[in-house]
């Protein structure tokens, strides 16, 4: 989709990825206590969020976001870069520890929630089933 010949950024996927990273309930259900058919790989989850945020920050989409939204995304990208530069941190055997006790994961989750708020959404706006 375009406006005046410029491609617009589709924010739906970004909001979905933010909400999943921001939700402890989602992470408990799909990372800590997954089923064989419904599970989430934390490494892939972080990577998909990171990629979606980076894409949103591309210059061609600058007009799609308010300055404070871009700032929030930039801060989140920097934190993901800092905390998950070593991807082995996300490939733990104990996902309960990762989700509930790993300071790096918790910090990213909390910032993802703040970023979601920046866009005017709350976790109750999303259905994970």
Walk through the language-model features, giving the residues of each.
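A general, composition-driven signal for non-globular sequence regions
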Residues: 4, 11-14, 80-81, 103, ...
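Generic structural motif recognizing short loop/turn segments at the entrances and edges of beta-strands
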Residues: 44, 59, 119-123
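Short terminal alpha-helical segments
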Residues: 1-56
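Amphipathic protein-protein interaction modules
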Residues: 56-114
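Structured alpha-helical bundle/scaffold domains in large eukaryotic membrane-trafficking regulators
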Residues: 88, 92, 117-128
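Hydrophobic transmembrane alpha-helix bundles
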Residues: 26-33, 66-69, 128-129
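Short, surface-exposed, charged/polar-biased interaction segments
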Residues: 39, 94-97, 126
